[in-house]
């Protein structure tokens, strides 16, 4: 999980993805604030994903809606879905993934802790 919210950070994250996850199926969970460079982030990051799930960052009045983000991402990627909640995004990512897949959540730092909590709860349920 990385905090990536601008063009330069997106380029660095793209390099990291290319270096560490070559030949892996990559699924993104992406949520951003509307005052960030989300179009550029989508353009830079989209080529490395197999699927992209967009989310609305909860509890932040500056959050870009998952639907608006999905419409933007769709300019650069043909497998994008807007999730109704973080829980749905995590569930969808698990359904799309296989054992060797990489699920990468990035964008607004404010929702990443919540994603981790959801994953922990899912692991507990599945154990």
What kind of region is each of these model predictions?
Residues 2, 52, 105-108:
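Residue-level signal for inorganic ion chemistry
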Residues 3-51:
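Nucleotide phosphate-binding/pyrophosphate-handling subdomain across enzymes
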Residues 5, 33-35, 58-59, 109-111:
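Short glycine-rich anion-binding loops that position phosphate/pyrophosphate groups of nucleotides
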Residues 11, 39, 91, 113-114:
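Alpha-helical elements of the RecA-like P-loop NTPase motor core of helicases
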Residues 17, 21, 73, 97, ...:
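Active-site catalytic pocket residues across diverse enzymes, especially alpha/beta-hydrolases
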Residues 26-28, 101-107:
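Generic beta-sheet signal
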Residues 42-102:
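C-terminal helical cap/extension that packs against the catalytic core
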Residues 108-127:
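Glycine/aspartate-rich loop-and-adjacent alpha/beta segment that forms the canonical ThDP
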């Amino acid at each position: 999980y990385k905090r990536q919210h601008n063009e330069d950070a997106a380029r660095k994250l793209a390099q990291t993805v290319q270096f560490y996850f070559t030949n892996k199926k990559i699924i993104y969970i992406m949520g951003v604030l509307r005052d960030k460079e989300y179009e550029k982030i989508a353009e830079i990051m989209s080529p490395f994903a197999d699927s992209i799930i967009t989310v609305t960052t909860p509890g932040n009045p500056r959050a870009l809606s998952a639907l608006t983000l999905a419409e933007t991402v769709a300019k650069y990627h043909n497998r994008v879905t807007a999730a109704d909640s973080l829980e749905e995004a995590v569930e969808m990512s698990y359904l799309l993934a296989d054992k060797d897949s990489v699920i990468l959540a990035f964008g607004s730092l404010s929702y990443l802790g919540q994603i981790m909590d959801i994953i922990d709860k899912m692991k507990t349920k599945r154990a």
